[in-house]
UniProtKB/Swiss-Prot annotation:
HAMAP family: THF_DHG_CYH. Belongs to the tetrahydrofolate dehydrogenase/cyclohydrolase family. It comes from the Bacteria. NCBIfam families: PRK10792.1, PRK14179.1, PRK14186.1, PRK14188.1. Pathway: One-carbon metabolism; tetrahydrofolate interconversion. Its EC number is 1.5.1.5, 3.5.4.9. This is Bifunctional protein FolD. NADP(+) binds at G165, R166, S167, S190. Homodimer.
Length: 284
């Protein structure tokens, strides 16, 4: 019988534990972790994500600041907002919600964030730490997936892990984290030939392509572990993953649902990294 990998339950457990750690830090050091979220424009999906992050931060006892800026803001003005938070000792994590309007260079915006406060883990300095085997700030979705695999006793050593999607946000950092656990990793993408055949070799399949119900059971070998990163809307507005859950669950050993799988863990890891940044600030 397929085991459901419940990201919502694990995220709630982690946030309860984190709230206790935050209270302890406040009592002993007088420090409250601070998270600043910057939203540019009024993209509906981004607004939902930002509200969820803000709500979660307040739940665990963080100081939470959200800046909502016009989609017409110039790049220099946005960088000035970031630099203000870089210099603010009460803020330990800075997150700029992506995507940004087309006239803003997201690479320059990421570079403007102090790497020590880059809780999304996108700054090249943090990418370098990850690829050199000394991770500091790691992209939240891949690190959340690793927590799920650990919680559900998935031993990655020697396993063949296949990732569909090569983004800097999920695919590439995911590959490195899996390599660090001695998995054999195949990173696939839109130009990969015979994708179905490659996927059927996977002991662990991680899907992040942004196409609803793209992966059917023909892609899955019996007993595989399937992690669905996708968040899509069907014709009725229902949230669905990249994996056709019902039919894939017939052959997979373990599988994440959408919603309630990877999504809650992404926010949990964002909070954890902000807390760790606050903790490091006490060691200066």
């Amino acid at each position: 019988m397929t085991e459901l990998i419940d990201g919502k339950a694990l995220a709630q457990k982690m946030q309860q534990e984190l709230a206790a750690k935050v209270n302890n830090l406040k009592q002993k050091k007088g420090i409250v972790p601070g998270l600043a979220v910057i939203l540019v424009g009024d993209d509906p999906a981004s607004q939902v994500y930002v509200r969820n992050k803000e709500r979660a931060a307040l739940t665990v006892g963080f100081k939470s600041e959200t800046v909502r800026l016009s989609e017409f803001i110039c790049q220099e003005e946005l960088i000035a907002v970031i630099e203000r938070y870089n210099a603010d000792n009460t803020i330990h994590g800075i997150l700029v919600q992506l995507p940004l309007p087309n006239h803003i260079n997201d690479k320059k915006i990421i570079l403007a964030i102090d790497p020590k406060k880059d809780v999304d883990g996108f700054h090249p300095m943090n990418t370098g730490h990850l690829w050199s085997g000394r991770p500091l700030m790691v992209p939240c979705t891949p690190s959340g997936i690793m927590e799920l695999l650990r919680e559900y006793n998935v031993n990655l050593e020697g396993k063949h892990a296949v990732i569909i999607g090569r983004s800097n946000i999920v695919g590439k950092p995911m590959a490195q984290l899996l390599l660090d656990k001695n998995a054999t990793v195949t990173l696939t993408h839109s130009r990969t030939r015979q994708l179905e055949e490659v996927c059927r070799c996977a002991d662990v399949l991680i899907v992040a392509i942004g196409q609803g119900h793209f992966i059917t059971k023909q892609y899955i070998k019996d007993g595989a572990i399937v992690i669905d990163v996708g968040m899509n809307r069907d014709d009725n507005g229902k949230l669905i993953g990249d994996v056709a859950f019902d039919e894939v669950a017939e052959v997979a050993a373990k599988i994440t649902p959408v919603p309630g799988g990877v999504g809650p863990m992404t926010i949990a890891m964002l909070l954890e990294q902000t807390y760790q940044s606050a903790l490091r600030s006490t060691h200066k």
